[in-house]
A protein has these predicted regions:
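Non-heme di-metal
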Residues: 123-398
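N-terminal intrinsically disordered, low-complexity tails
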Residues: 1, 5-47
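Short alpha-helix boundary/capping motifs
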Residues: 104-106, 117, 205, 305
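Membrane-interacting alpha-helical segments
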Residues: 40-60, 124-126
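N-terminal low-complexity, intrinsically disordered patches enriched in charged
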Residues: 14-15, 91, 293
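Amphipathic alpha-helical packing elements
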Residues: 52, 56-114
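Short, conserved sequence motifs enriched in acidic/basic residues, glycine, and aromatics
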Residues: 80, 119, 153-154
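Short, intrinsically disordered, charge-balanced linker/junction segments flanking boundaries
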Residues: 113-121, 357-358
């Protein structure tokens, strides 16, 4: 039995013939083979570079910010500073300052309204259940895309830092939807399996999944024009079409309920999620534009046509979802209103990444949604929170 006073002496190891001491150390740390280990595509170039630098210059070369790249970089991804992409770090800090947790939101009024037979119409109840049916698994797909795909291929540590925060926020969002489902006493199997049983939800997920699988493949590596375009396409689909378009029918519907003083606890959580997802979308667009700036050869005429076609398909799928969730007018909304809104959003996302608008002259029929995005966490719009608080970074001992 060891005590704190005893000196711990390492057991000497005999080097194996033909194996370097460093390699033997790595091998000894692995007790058994692990099947299909995901390769961190961003790490390998940095390791190789440092190995070469150590031989030629007598030691590892320190990171120069100017040498950093979004993909295919040769700098050490473990060294966060010096910063090159300060916009990514600033977004990370902003996201941390906006931290929230679902259980902070009081669901008492929502529960009473849901249990009241006359509290909500059947159309309103359908909207809520369809919304939750899509979102409970959508954020899990988004998290999978980040941690099993995108993160491995990004070589800028500032951007990786934001991606880690984003993945955590996706977990919080899934937690929030589960919290709403549990609070209202909904059939969990019905809600959580909706992406297999509700066609309008399944169609959206089937559109997204190939773009996750492409970059999750353990054999996938960037470094060629084709694979770099595959990653760029995946970034565009998730930033502009999933988080930047597929979420907006649901957000609008639930926040419209909140504006009528219905389901205010759920609406407040959706408000925070909307704010988080807006940050994710903006970060993704900045990442896309920086990647394009560093790799202009990827942004070909053919590639742009392919992206435009994906935008058009996404608008079509989200409009079908709007029709399914809202077969009749409710809350002062109807499905046809969303056609203009989705086209307006698609135009905005397209121009943000350097494409021409797909649907000219479309205007925003829901200007109040922009106000929702801009609201700060400290402003309790739906007044369901009993106590406001500051996140850890803003606390003072005074």
């Amino acid at each position: 039995m060891l005590t704190w006073d005893e000196e711990v002496k390492p057991t000497p190891r005999m080097p194996q013939p033909g194996v370097s001491q460093g390699a033997q150390g790595v091998a000894s740390a692995v007790n058994r083979p692990v099947p299909q280990v995901l390769h961190d595509g961003a790490l390998a170039p940095a390791v190789a570079t440092h190995a070469t630098a150590g031989i030629s210059a007598g030691g590892p070369r320190r990171v120069n910010a100017a040498d950093k790249r979004i993909i295919n970089g040769q700098t050490d991804v473990n060294q966060l500073v010096p910063f090159k992409y300060k916009w990514a770090w600033e977004k990370y800090l902003s996201s941390c300052a906006n931290h929230w947790m679902p259980q902070e939101v009081n669901m008492t009024r929502d529960i009473a309204l849901w249990k009241d037979p006359n509290g909500l119409t059947e159309d309103e109840r359908r909207i809520i259940k369809r919304n939750l049916g899509f979102f409970v698994t959508a954020d899990s797909l988004a998290a999978n895309n980040i941690v099993l795909g995108t993160y491995r291929h990004i070589t800028a540590p500032e951007c990786r830092q934001f991606l880690l925060r984003q993945a955590f926020e996706e977990a919080i969002h899934t937690h929030a939807y589960q919290y709403i489902v549990e609070s209202l006493g909904l059939d969990e199997s019905e809600i959580f399996n909706a992406y297999n049983e509700v066609q309008s939800i399944r169609d959206k997920d089937e559109f997204l999944i190939p773009f996750i699988q492409a970059i999750m493949n353990p054999e996938f590596k960037t470094g060629t024009p084709e694979t770099d375009q595959t990653l760029l396409k995946s970034l565009i689909v998730f930033a502009c079409l999933m988080e930047g378009l597929f979420f907006y029918v649901g957000f609008t519907q639930i926040l419209a309920l909140g504006r009528q003083n219905k389901m205010t606890g759920a609406a407040e959580q959706y408000q925070y999620i909307l704010r988080d997802e807006s940050m994710h979308c903006n970060f993704g667009i900045d990442l896309i534009n920086q990647l394009k700036l560093e790799n202009p050869q990827l942004w070909t005429a053919e590639f742009k046509l392919e992206i435009r076609a994906l935008f058009e398909k996404a608008v079509e799928l989200e409009y079908r979802y709007a029709e399914d969730t809202m077969p009749r007018g409710v809350l002062g909304l109807n499905a046809s209103m969303f056609k203009g809104y989705l086209r307006y959003i698609a135009n905005r996302r397209a121009t943000q990444i350097g494409l021409e608008p797909l649907f000219p002259n479309e205007e925003n029929p829901f200007p109040w949604m922009s106000e929702m995005i801009d609201l700060k966490k400290e402003r309790n719009f739906f007044e369901t929170r009993v106590i406001e608080y500051q996140s850890g970074g803003a606390l003072s001992w005074d």
